[in-house]
Design a protein with these regions (language model features):
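Short beta-strand-centered segment that lines the nucleotide-binding/catalytic pocket of NTP-utilizing
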Residues: 77-90
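ATP-dependent small-molecule kinase phosphotransfer cores
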Residues: 87-158
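ATP-dependent NMP and nucleoside kinases share a basic, alpha-helical "lid"
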Residues: 147-155, 162-194
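Hydrophobic anchor at the beta1->P-loop junction of P-loop NTPases
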Residues: 56
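ATP-binding Walker
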Residues: 62
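Walker A/P-loop
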Residues: 65
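P-loop (Walker A) phosphate-binding loop of NTP-binding proteins
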Residues: 59
Length: 197
C-alpha cells in the first residue's frame, strides 16, 4: 500500500528537522526513524534500551489515524490520544471536573448524570475568554497526566515506544517531555479528497 504521507521528524532535544516519505516507515519488520543527522535508526524492540516517547500531530485528513493504527499493532508500543485523556479528566469526580463545574456553574451545559453536554459546552466556550479559561484548566491536567504515564512506563522498562497524538503538540510545548515530535504532512488535495468521503 502506498501512503501519500510525509513525516516531518523533529528531535525534541536538538530541534533539527527532516522531511521523509512515510511509506518507507511502514514496514512490518521494524519501525525506522530518521535521525537528525540523516541516518536511519531501527526502532524494533530488540534494539532499544530506553523507551522512546514520540509525539504525533498533523492537519485533519493527513493520515494520523492510519499511522497510529499501524503503530498500535507493533509489540512494545502504546498509543495515547490527548483528546480521549481530556474527556476522561473532565468526567464527574475528577479534579478538572470540579474546577470546571465551579467555573461554569451558571451555564446550562449539564446532563442529568452531572456530566458535561459537549454540544452545549462548545457553544458556551465560543468566546475566547471562556475557551481560554477552560483550556487553562484542562490542558495542564492532560500534560501532567501524560507526563506521569511516560515516567511510569520508563520506570517499568517494558514499553519500547510510547506515542502521543495531540492537536496542540507544538503549542502546548510537548517537546519538553517527548523525545521526538512527528508532524504528519499530506498534500492539501489528498486531505480534501479524504474529508469528502
Amino acid at each position: 500500500m502506498r501512503l501519500h504521507l510525509k513525516l516531518m521528524h523533529m528531535s525534541a532535544k536538538t530541534g533539527m528537522r527532516q522531511n521523509k516519505d512515510l511509506s518507507s516507515f511502514m514496514r512490518d519488520d521494524a519501525l525506522d526513524c530518521i535521525c537528525p543527522d540523516g541516518t536511519r535508526e531501527k526502532m524494533d524492540a530488540g534494539s532499544m534500551e530506553r523507551m522512546k516517547f514520540i509525539g504525533i500531530t498533523g492537519g485533519v485528513g493527513a493520515g494520523k489515524s492510519e499511522i497510529l493504527h499501524y503503530l498500535e499493532t507493533k509489540d512494545g508500543v502504546k498509543v495515547m490520544l490527548a483528546d480521549e485523556i481530556a474527556h476522561e479528566l473532565m468526567l464527574p469526580g475528577t479534579e478538572c471536573y470540579q474546577k470546571l463545574k465551579d467555573m461554569f456553574s451558571d451555564e446550562d451545559i449539564w446532563n442529568e448524570d452531572g456530566s458535561f453536554d459537549r454540544k452545549k459546552l462548545a457553544t458556551v466556550i465560543f468566546s475566547d475568554e471562556k475557551r481560554d479559561a477552560l483550556n487553562g484548566i484542562v490542558h495542564p491536567a492532560v500534560k501532567k497526566y501524560i507526563r506521569t504515564v511516560a515516567d511510569t512506563e520508563r520506570e517499568n522498562g517494558v514499553l519500547k515506544i510510547l506515542v502521543l497524538e495531540a492537536a496542540l503538540l507544538i503549542e502546548e510545548h510537548y517537546d519538553e517531555i517527548c523525545d521526538e515530535l512527528w508532524y504528519i504532512y499530506t498534500r492539501e488535495d489528498i486531505r480534501k479528497e479524504r474529508l469528502m468521503r
